[in-house]
């Protein structure tokens, strides 16, 4: 119900009755509870001046999300966009802070650094911690959100951490925590707040140093048996004088990503991915992207990605494929992928699948993940917010 109100501000109680099959009494009770908890608010709908006869009686009342009703916090762990952030109930970013991190090798130290930064950001805003639904963590790792563990990260060199990252963030913030692979976090964010709204089947390709995919089918993430779905970076491509984390020399990770672009431009003094060089990769790639003289090299990397997009489109038949990330959403990269899909694989505007650039940045995805998980789902802790609102009312009565 909250999802409907968020997606359609101004929806009436009668419309909710019809959509969800509620009785008028049930809809009134639910709306009253949400209003009392401060999560939604009522407002007078504007008069429809196109009708010949004016409506007589009480103004029509609509429901909308109270943007200050709840908040969500996020932690994005990346060499490119290391940030902590806060968004309101409509997904609007209201505060963020970059986190300077030069090493990601120790799981607990990394979690402590980011969660402490987030706690300070929350304190700086002055927002009551009781109004936060939770914390979303987006990072390059294989995750099992239901078990709250980071299982493996080739990118950071993490093994099964037995929940240490989750424990550290929860301990330092006191809030519910959801950890998710960055491609999946972006996919969920685009589905609710971005270009994939109202689309039930799509794929999102996140491209930065390496590439990964978040797949959504019937509005649910596809994780695979062991949570390994989406490893497009290991699709076979052209041979390169480089070596992937998996040991091969023909992965898309070496030709369609930032690592491949940096190597081709002579920015690397090594041919095998080195996780201790993550900050260098990020700084160098951002500089390359910012120089228009490199547009053709970036476009070529996008063309290489098309080799992976074609079989993915044929196998999954998504309505939309989103290219995201600092490299993936770059104009030259996107154009290269789009043109190669048309030239070599016959895709056009009449094809069943369309390509689009992502609207949500990785730095936004973490807090939007928390909002999606802990507000617009059955995991909303309504009683906590209802009690918080009641306590505020009691305080006002004695003020």
Regions found by a protein language model. Name each.
Residues 62-64, 72-76, 132-136, 202-206, ...:
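Short glycine-aspartate micro-motif
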Residues 93-96, 100-201, 332-343:
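Glycine-rich phosphate-binding loop and adjoining helix at the ATP-binding site
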Residues 80-82, 142-144, 212:
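Short, acidic Gly/Pro/Ser/Thr-rich loop/turn segments
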Residues 2-98, 106-128, 252-399:
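ATP-binding/phosphotransfer module of carbohydrate and carboxylate kinases, centering on a glycine-rich
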Residues 96-98, 105-110, 160-287, 399:
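Glycine/GP-enriched mid-protein hinge/lid loop-to-helix segment characteristic of carbohydrate kinases
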Residues 91-92, 147-149, 219, 227:
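Detector for glycine-centered tight turns/loop "hinges" at secondary-structure junctions
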Residues 140-143, 209-210, 327-328:
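Short glycine-rich anion-binding loops that position phosphate/pyrophosphate groups of nucleotides
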């Amino acid at each position: 119900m909250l999802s409907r109100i968020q997606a359609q501000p101004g929806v009436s109680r009668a419309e909710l009755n019809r959509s969800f099959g509620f009785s008028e009494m049930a809809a009134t009770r639910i709306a009253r509870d949400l209003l009392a908890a401060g999560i939604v608010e009522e407002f007078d709908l504007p008069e429809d001046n196109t009708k010949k006869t004016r409506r007589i009686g009480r103004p029509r009342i609509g429901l909308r999300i109270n943007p200050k009703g709840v908040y969500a916090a996020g932690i994005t762990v990346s060499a490119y966009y290391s940030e902590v952030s806060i968004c309101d109930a409509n997904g609007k970013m209201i505060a963020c802070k970059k986190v300077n991190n030069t090493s990601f090798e120790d799981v607990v130290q990394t979690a402590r650094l980011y969660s402490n930064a987030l706690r300070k950001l929350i304190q700086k805003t002055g927002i009551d911690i009781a109004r936060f639904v939770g914390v979303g963590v987006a990072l390059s790792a294989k995750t099992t959100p239901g078990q709250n563990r980071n299982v493996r990260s080739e990118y950071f060199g993490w093994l099964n951490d037995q929940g240490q990252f989750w424990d550290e963030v929860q301990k330092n913030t006191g809030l519910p925590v959801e950890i998710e692979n960055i491609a999946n976090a972006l996919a969920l964010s685009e589905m609710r707040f971005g270009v994939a709204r109202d689309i039930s089947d799509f794929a999102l390709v996140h491209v930065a140093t390496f590439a990964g995919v978040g797949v959504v089918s019937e509005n649910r993430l596809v994780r695979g048996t062991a949570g390994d779905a989406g490893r497009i970076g290991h699709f076979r491509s052209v041979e390169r004088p480089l070596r992937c984390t998996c040991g091969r020399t023909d992965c898309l990770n070496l030709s369609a990503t930032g690592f491949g672009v940096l190597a081709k431009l002579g920015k690397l003094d090594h041919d095998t991915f080195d996780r201790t060089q993550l900050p260098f990769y990020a700084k160098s790639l951002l500089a390359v992207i910012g120089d228009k003289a490199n547009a053709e090299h970036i476009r070529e990397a996008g063309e290489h990605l098309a080799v992976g997009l074609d079989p993915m489109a044929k196998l999954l038949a998504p309505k939309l494929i989103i290219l995201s990330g600092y490299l993936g959403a770059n104009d030259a990269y996107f154009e290269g992928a789009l043109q190669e899909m048309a030239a070599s694989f016959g895709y056009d505007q009449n094809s069943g699948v369309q390509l689009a650039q992502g609207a949500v940045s990785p730095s936004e995805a973490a807090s939007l993940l928390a909002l999606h998980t802990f507000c617009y789902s059955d995991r909303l802790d309504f009683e906590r917010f209802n009690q918080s609102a009641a306590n505020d009312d009691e305080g006002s009565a004695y003020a």
